[in-house]
């Protein structure tokens, strides 16, 4: 096992004595502007308040610094990013496979699954696979896809409808309708 020094991960913001500017534009704890002051004066004010001096915008002239609790600032920032990730809905494409001879009972089960996918906000990919002599009866396949499209017309919008057969299958993609 190799020994070594543990390196602290670099902070995104410089704090307290890490700030290199001579003068800074200072913002108070409540967000009020305190004007342009020397770095030492800003550090003293932060120390009096019992919190940190954090460099918010290092590229500004002079750099903008704020008096705040840095630990609390990082916590709020991570909480906000987690909240944003939670709100993002990753749209998945769910696939259901049909055959030209799919019986009515199986059709109803597959249709129920499609309805569930669309209500959850996911896209649905309907693959119609032909085997053997079924290739000669492509019209039956198109009828199945039309039936699915008509049954789901209130829930979904057709994104792509097959005009010709691709290999031994036809693919139709449905997207959920936007809710008003």
Curated annotation (Swiss-Prot):
GO BP field: ribosome disassembly
Single GO cellular component term: membrane
Keyword Cell membrane: no
The organism's place on the tree of life at top rank: Bacteria
Record keywords: Cytoplasm, Initiation factor, Protein biosynthesis
GO molecular function, one term: translation initiation factor activity
Main location: cytoplasm
Stored SUPFAM superfamilies: Translation initiation factor IF3, C-terminal domain, Translation initiation factor IF3, N-terminal domain
Pfam short name (any one): IF3_C
Cellular compartment(s): Cytoplasm
Function: IF-3 binds to the 30S ribosomal subunit and shifts the equilibrium between 70S ribosomes and their 50S and 30S subunits in favor of the free subunits, thus enhancing the availability of 30S subunits on which protein synthesis initiation begins.
Similarity comment: Belongs to the IF-3 family.
PANTHER family: TRANSLATION INITIATION FACTOR IF-3, TRANSLATION INITIATION FACTOR IF-3, MITOCHONDRIAL
Subunit composition and interactions: Monomer.
The protein's name: Translation initiation factor IF-3
Gene transcribed to yield this protein: infC
